[in-house]
């Protein structure tokens, strides 16, 4: 996939995030690895990734999911897509919360960049129709995540450390 095939809008809304250029590089690598793994045709597509804080994501989580608590990542697909199907040009939005991501990375002993890449991939798969509501869906989605992260030289995020 060429670097220009997918347009990624990055917005740092709130939170103590790294420099926007570094975030854009991490997001682009993660999205392109996912696109390649899924075998999607090169197509002009667009998505936005908003880097925010726990307070902002908690508001969205309460409004859209009925869960009044922060979460690490939310995805808002522009249009419904069946998992594995070629998406349209507008993919949707991924929102990521700094404090939750940082806390999870620390608690799980993972580099922040690896955890962030995982959440970008996770959110991107949601935009492409993947879900984890059932065990069968979770198995498929998590398998894809593992493959994509492996291509990025990131260890299995679901491996239980002893």
Swiss-Prot record:
GO molecular function terms noted in the UniProt entry: metalloendopeptidase activity; RNA endonuclease activity; zinc ion binding
Statement: the UniProt record of this protein carries the keyword Zinc: yes
Binding-site residues, Zn(2+): 122, 126, 132
Gene name linked to the record: ybeY
Enzyme class: hydrolase
Organism listed in the record: Brucella anthropi (strain ATCC 49188 / DSM 6882 / CCUG 24695 / JCM 21032 / LMG 3331 / NBRC 15819 / NCTC 12168 / Alc 37)
SUPFAM superfamilies on file: Metalloproteases ('zincins'), catalytic domain (SSF55486)
InterPro entries xrefs: MetalPrtase_cat_dom_sf_prd, YbeY, YbeY_CS
PANTHER family: ENDORIBONUCLEASE YBEY, CHLOROPLASTIC
Superkingdom of source: Bacteria
Protein name, entry field: Endoribonuclease YbeY
